[in-house]
Amino acid sequence: MRWILCWSLTLCLMAQTALGALHTKRPQVVTKYGTLQGKQMHVGKTPIQVFLGVPFSRPPLGILRFAPPEPPEPWKGIRDATTYPPGCLQESWGQLASMYVSTRERYKWLRFSEDCLYLNVYAPARAPGDPQLPVMVWFPGGAFIVGAASSYEGSDLAAREKVVLVFLQHRLGIFGFLSTDDSHARGNWGLLDQMAALRWVQENIAAFGGDPGNVTLFGQSAGAMSISGLMMSPLASGLFHRAISQSGTALFRLFITSNPLKVAKKVAHLAGCNHNSTQILVNCLRALSGTKVMRVSNKMRFLQLNFQRDPEEIIWSMSPVVDGVVIPDDPLVLLTQGKVSSVPYLLGVNNLEFNWLLPYIMKFPLNRQAMRKETITKMLWSTRTLLNITKEQVPLVVEEYLDNVNEHDWKMLRNRMMDIVQDATFVYATLQTAHYHRDAGLPVYLYEFEHHARGIIVKPRTDGADHGDEMYFLFGGPFATGLSMGKEKALSLQMMKYWANFARTGNPNDGNLPCWPRYNKDEKYLQLDFTTRVGMKLKEKKMAFWMSLYQSQRPEKQRQF
């Protein structure tokens, strides 16, 4: 009788412990580096445990500027993890970009610091013995010069799909990608930060209820390009098991800086650090304050259209380099050789990638006065390095896209100009990458997202999906802002389900959703909108045109799809 009473008390205590784990307002987890105390929130009746500002590296300050990240210092006692960490130092429009992607009812203003190697974790509350959950690690976009983990809210996706979400951030711009193309500054610091975060996930995510053996990378724009690049990096092998690239791959022209020493010398010149010795140059830049480095960054005028400058001298961004270690070779060469991670890959584009956000940031004049064929030709001339075309090919592009357009139809001219940029960059790079992964025998799923979100209030309404619009639906924006209609909520649920299914199994289908065909030789893809449809051969004729241009430039690297 006595042992029955003891056992009953034990079971009662276990149940109370489990219940406490589910409902405590100040959840704690023990990581490899120390104990964290987070906070609990609810999505409907589902409790979500949130841990903010979790260090995955030592602060990249002093001698660690322009150096690989190092593991974080362990701490004693309980570390508070209830405050959003500062984003990495970045361009001033990073705050605007953060407002654009935010799905919170009230916007959280970002802070910025060079001490920024932190991540945020959103995990469904669990009872002891519950099975481990799939892990999804988000890579922010921002042209490698803006972006922050705290711009994103993960509670809806984590709660509705029972996944553990990790939002990372990494060094940006000069801090993240300065390279002298030698041992004094090899570059790719931002990519190394990403891999340090992924190693932290492998070591610690089980404490949050996540499965380190089921990690999916997903990201947008520059984040999507980074993921595509990590799929070609031997240093990232074993750190993830599936990958999703939204509006960007490593074949995007912006991903690789082809002459990093030239860029480093320009940075040094603007900073007053000119020197023939790259060692002295780097040490001089390392000694500057973060504020001074950002003043130099502002003078570089990244991502700015400039009609007065020689297009060959325009530096669009600071970005990764082929260093032989992190990125062993040109991404196109690696893809051609099939040197990619053997993991399922889901990727896609939006149908109006160059509609408002990017033209606004890049100061593209798309107003009525500027929309003339002569002005568009000048724009193409100025952006030809971004579009990856030669000056001799500019007239061919004008003929292909503008030949049958009335000179006075400024709206059609604007639409064609937007088509040129998105086709030459996002669409071409995405489709080519999909083909190479498919031909390597890997599962590939392709999409085109087509719906503009009513809840994105910082830009004008359009009839299609601008760059980044899909994130509003992926992170449950229609449920958070109160500005969406029922159909948008249904689309959001559908997207969350597709993405989470892919994270669970490597296949977005589950029998309850419209079938998403695998991307094979028939080139079928999913058109995501209120009515989901299957398309075939996305922009086939235009892609054939761009293929012919690029083949004529470097036939030794290109091949037909």
From Swiss-Prot:
A molecular function (GO) term: carboxylic ester hydrolase activity
UniProt key word Disulfide bond: yes
Signal peptide: 1-20
Gene Ontology CC terms, in alphabetical order: extracellular region
UniProt-annotated glycosylation sites, renumbered to this chain: 214, 276, 388
Major location category of this protein: secreted
Keyword vocabulary terms for this entry: Disulfide bond, Glycoprotein, Hydrolase, Secreted, Serine esterase, Signal
EC code: 3.1.1.-
A Pfam family that the UniProt record links to this protein: COesterase
Keyword Disulfide bond assigned: yes
Disulfide bonds: 88-116, 273-284
Main enzyme class: hydrolase
Domain of life of the source: Eukaryota
Active-site residue list: 221, 353, 467
UniProt-annotated location(s): Secreted
Protein purpose: Probable carboxylesterase.
Family statement: Belongs to the type-B carboxylesterase/lipase family.
Protein name: Carboxylesterase 4A
Gene: CES4A
